[in-house]
Amino acid sequence: MFNKVVKEFQWGQHKVRLETGEVARQASGAVIVDVEDTVVLATVVGAKSAKPGQDFFPLTVDYLEKTYSAGKIPGGFFRREGRPSEHETLTSRLIDRPLRPLFPEGFYNEVQVVIHVLSVNPEIPADIPALIGASAALAVSGLPFNGPVGAARVAYIDNAYVLNPTRDQIKASSLDLVVAGTERAVLMVESEADQLSEDVMLGAVVFGHEQMQIAIDAIHELVRDGGKPEWDWQPAPKNEALIARVTELAQNDLLAAYQLRDKQARSAKLKEVYAATSAKLEEDALAAGTVAADKATVGNILFDIEAKIVRSQILNGEPRIDGRDTRTVRPIEIRTGVLPRTHGSALFTRGETQALVVATLGTKGDEQIIDALEGEYRERFMLHYNMPPFATGETGRVGSPKRREIGHGRLAKRALVKCLPSADEFGYSIRVVSEITESNGSSSMASVCGGCLALMDAGVPMKAHVAGIAMGLILEGNKFAVLTDILGDEDHLGDMDFKVAGTEQGVTALQMDIKIQGITKEIMQVALAQAKEGRMHILGKMTSAVSGANTQLSEFAPRMITIKINPEKIRDVIGKGGSVIRALTEETGTTIDISDDGVVTIASTSSDGMAEAKKRIEQITAEIEVGQVYEGTVLKLLDFGAIVNLLPGKDGLLHISEIVNERVKDINDYLKEGQQVKVKVIQTDEKGRVRLSAKALLNEAAAAAQSDTPPQQ
């Protein structure tokens, strides 16, 4: 019934099992990957034909985590998984990026890759098994795919690279890098680092590429024994006559368009060329009595002509689209404190790319609580990236963030997080929001620069300035050119897009997407060195504008004080059902967080409110001591004495015999409910009962007065 094929191999410190032929047999391809009890099912379905008029490759990748994989039941009313989490979205992008370039040009059939996480070992992240599974599923499916792809995670611990580290090892590492590629080439890198050198980063990429070969070999074996027949797909033959005619009609005008340095003017000119070319082809068809070529086909030909123009100009040493040489960074303008009532803000402009970045400080209660498969944890630092359509002069949908925005936000967060002060040094939670107001390439790196400046404006004591730069590459045969600070058009027309962020000391984030095979270690070395040169230039501009973090927080930012209480007293501060702490926060206008070890953090924009909250918490948690004198309030009168409140929640008995020295016939002659009375604690017992005395203070006062009286002559 089943044609089950299994391949097993040892990969670093883990044993890996690939399996196909038993589960999801109606999919084009399906593979189960098991890495030390982290199990994923990767499936691929490809449409047998492209939709009419399709002019792009419709690939979708969905990585889905099932809560049952960790032995949990989902929260919420419906008790089932809902919209994808940020982690699922980021992992979907991570898998998509190395797979997409390996489908052949002209293949427009819809392809859907779905990965289900079925079982989770908390120590083994599921993203690498998912990427290996997706690659293997595509390989066994028979779809036209120039894979397989391998992947590896690399850590850097004690000056040594570690392959596919556990979660505990990742926490101890100064590097978390994921690399994916084929047998011959690296295709994708995603990383976060603690100010490491370019040599260490490149070494990690090379190490990961070498170590992934065993996974690629295992996929080849799986295909050999359990793969489906290869699809009989051939790209549509090129219409050489149409290509020649479009080139004749448009090439000179496209050349003229790329002499325009302004993006808006250039875009307008390109639209004119596209429209005029289509109109002329329709006239040709009408005159010949034939059907004109569809606009998608014409558009693809025009795009190819554009690419040839731009690429040849750069490789021949001519100026780039905006007139720069290959190493020059666009003009930079920096302004901080641009918004009056925010905690920190910066406007970072680089050429036609601009980011308005805002930093907000909060308390521990503002931290993001994430319920992940491996367990719940809190995020103290959040960074959100938004790019509305007006940033590129277009109209479009405005709403929840798209995958691209989530990915760019995470990259900027990775770049900054290692340079933040620790929670012990700076107890605030931090949210940074980057609003892209103009975009022409490298908006995520503008978010890094603007984010660092906004944090410093907010008074966050950053370890160092952090800057980011986007680089490009054009490669033809043995000739190549590395481009510093790429434009949007150069990104689309180039062969590699990689972004490097870091400080003067080293790299904090590296993201690389390579669209072709054949990029060597030497080319990457040149690219990283040129990126460092550009980063240092930007850091110089940033340091000149803002030398360091503000020493004063914004008047609108919360202030914090911390006190330590006995952990056994936490329940007294919280009260039944939270009644005490709720009343405290409402009456003092503060936010109060209490950790399990008894550290109380009080935050407010009002210093008076913080002082009052601190005083009341100290009163609630204070211990009644024998011999101490208190100013108490009479709560209740009894026949034999009075109940006096000394501290919040702490009362004592003032016996009728301890009010005054003479005999008291009627307690009402001496005390009234609500009266303030000074009393001394004379006894406590093991049950917590407290006995008070007022006459003891009277006797002490009388004795003191007598000792001050001069002797009789």
From Swiss-Prot:
One Pfam family per UniProt: S1
Locations listed in the record: Cytoplasm
The protein's Enzyme Commission number: 2.7.7.8
Catalysed reaction, written as an equation: RNA(n+1) + phosphate = RNA(n) + a ribonucleoside 5'-diphosphate
Domain annotation KH: ranges: 558-617
Protein name: Polyribonucleotide nucleotidyltransferase
UniProt enzyme class: transferase
Needed co-factor(s): Mg(2+)
GO biological process: mRNA catabolic process; RNA processing
Key word Cytoplasm present: yes
Keywords from the named record: Cytoplasm, Magnesium, Metal-binding, Nucleotidyltransferase, RNA-binding, Transferase
Record gene name: pnp
Residue intervals of the S1 motif domain: 627-695
Record keyword Mitochondrion present: no
Major location category of this protein: cytoplasm
